[in-house]
């Protein structure tokens, strides 16, 4: 199973290329807007990938920039892909723009390096664990009736990426995640058993950073998305860092490089995958299973 094109990723690549063409031509956004009788804000929005352009609008823009040949064909192909809708658009009213963008990156990434400091990362969560996490958000920001169920459904559907043979997923979880209670004890036991099963996937490397480890990477959870290297100049890595109610997207070469170095440092300080598996099993059995059984007795 491989991933089809993500409209989110294509739109961002197209936006970056069109912005680069305008700058190479020495034209301002206002001058392009005036020539095409578009509003300056339209130029700004599509160059920041806030909105998309219809394929015919891209063709008109390329005519103005006098772009022909293979480069034109590539950009028009990106425009066609960007105009498609991802499955997550079915839930558009329930999802923030940041979250839709995140799913779009996840949908097409060739690799993901995930560091989670507080909870199990979303693509590895059980339904019960996810429901408790999402329900907890409503204590900060009340959610409309039915929203929690839809959000859980989206999270579970995201997990289809685990079945992609072309995805390489590396996950480092802080050891505290294994002992931080989410829901009741049975939820935690089942979640840790799920981590053990997912850790056996051939395309997934799961490591635990022990509490005794000495490392220099502190701060929020983050994901580094890597995209296919197919000699396409429009490919670039993306980093997303998580905040309380939103996320921050970083695309600069320096930022993506620093986060890759940070992830490697975390991985180096972590237990090996077999050692991590043993720790997860031990925690599930000694910390949650026995306590669960005693509580149920």
Which stretches of residues belong to each language-model region?
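Acidic-residue sensor for enzyme active/binding pockets
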Residues: 47, 57, 106-108, 175, ...
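Aromatic side chains
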Residues: 46, 64-65, 87-91, 99-102, ...
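A short alpha-helix capping/helix-coil boundary motif
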Residues: 10, 36-38, 98-99, 172-175
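Short secondary-structure junction/hinge motifs that connect adjacent elements
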Residues: 34-36, 93-95, 279-281
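Short hydrophobic/aromatic-rich motifs at helix boundaries and adjacent loops
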Residues: 1-2, 11-14, 29-34, 44, ...
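Hydrophobic protein-protein interaction segments
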Residues: 111, 115-297
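Basic, Lys/Arg-rich alpha-helical nucleic-acid-recognition elements, primarily the DNA-binding modules
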Residues: 1-86
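Helix-turn-helix/homeodomain-like alpha-helical modules used for DNA recognition
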Residues: 76, 83-134
């Amino acid at each position: 199973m491989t991933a089809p094109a993500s409209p989110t990723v294509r739109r961002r690549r197209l936006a970056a290329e069109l912005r680069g063409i305008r700058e190479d031509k020495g034209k301002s956004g206002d001058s392009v807007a005036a020539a095409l009788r578009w509003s300056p804000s339209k130029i700004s929005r599509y160059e920041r990938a806030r909105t998309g352009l219809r394929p015919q609008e891209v063709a008109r823009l390329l005519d103005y920039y006098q772009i022909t040949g293979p480069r034109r064909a590539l950009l028009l192909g990106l425009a066609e892909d960007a105009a498609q809708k991802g499955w997550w658009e079915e839930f558009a009213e329930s999802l923030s723009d940041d979250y839709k963008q995140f799913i779009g990156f996840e949908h097409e990434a060739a690799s993901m390096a995930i560091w989670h400091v507080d909870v199990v990362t979303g693509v590895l969560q059980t339904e019960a664990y996810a429901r408790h996490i999402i329900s907890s958000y409503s204590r900060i920001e009340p959610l409309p009736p039915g929203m929690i169920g839809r959000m859980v459904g989206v999270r579970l559907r995201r997990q289809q990426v685990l079945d992609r043979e072309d995805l390489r997923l590396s996950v480092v979880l802080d050891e505290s995640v294994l002992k931080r209670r989410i829901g009741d004890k049975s939820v935690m036991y089942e979640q840790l058993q799920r981590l053990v099963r997912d850790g056996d996937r051939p395309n997934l490397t799961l490591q635990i950073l022990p509490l005794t480890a000495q490392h220099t990477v502190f701060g929020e959870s983050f994901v580094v998305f890597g995209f296919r290297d197919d000699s396409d100049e429009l490919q670039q890595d993306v980093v997303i860092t998580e905040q309380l109610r939103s996320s921050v997207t970083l695309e600069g070469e320096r930022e993506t490089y620093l986060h890759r170095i940070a992830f490697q440092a975390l991985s180096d300080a972590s237990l090996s995958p077999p050692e991590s598996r043993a720790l997860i099993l031990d925690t599930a059995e000694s910390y949650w299973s026995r306590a669960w059984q005693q509580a149920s007795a």
